[in-house]
Amino acid sequence: MAERVLEISSIHKAFGDHEVLKGVDLNLDKGDVVSIIGSSGSGKTTLLRCVNLLEEYQQGEIKIDGRVIGYSNKKNKRTRVNNKQITQDRALTGMVFQSFNLFPHLSAAENIMLALRKVQKKSKKESAEIAQHWLEQVGLPDRGTSYPGQLSGGQQQRVAIARAVAMNPKLMLFDEVTSALDPELINEVLDVIKSLAIDGMTMLIVTHEMRFAYEVSKKVIFMNDGVIGEQGTPDEIFKNPSSERLSAFLKNTKF
């Protein structure tokens, strides 16, 4: 039986009077790679931010590795857990954003080592070994001493990916990680994510790169106006869409 890593049940999220997520259900098993596509404003990024607990949500439940995260139900009252528990829950996921968010005063290796030492309390020696391992995995074996300002955008994003996976999360979240890159740098980042997929990393990916989503995903989710409009295998979504809305969306993409 497959090991369930992520279980999203009827998530509702509103900003004021504007409901962004209108009851989303989604499951990922260990090793699954699921891509989320859809127009801007459809709720893709908000869903990822709810999973990572960067956003609070008003209804529903998210479980990672069988444990409810972010909220507790005591005496039938739903309450947000304390900040210490939020930090522990968030550590179950690794998230890579559009912007690289590297510390400019730290080298590539030091950026990766920081959370290993501060959060996981690993020794400097072990943290350095882990950092070097992941720099090699993302194709930057000789750039550990380089600072972010000395790296290209693609290289910085690869360091950001290495920093996230070095923490050994149960689930990786990618939020349009190539959208801030020059076109010629996109493939080097996508190739790193593909290699993680081959290695069995469980991943939920928001992307505008349709060909990449087709090639890397076990399942593709099309979000439309805060709900899952359609989901299926890459062939079902990209070659045989069943809704007019998805067909119209795909006509405006580069797939």
Where in this protein do the model-derived segments appear?
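Conserved ABC ATPase signature
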Residues: Y147-L151, Q155
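A short, proline-enriched helix->beta-strand linker immediately N-terminal to the Walker B motif
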Residues: A166-K170
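Conserved ABC transporter NBD signature motif
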Residues: G60-K74
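Short coil-to-helix segment of the ABC ATPase nucleotide-binding domain corresponding to the Q-loop/switch region
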Residues: L106-L114
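ABC ATPase "signature
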Residues: Q231-G232
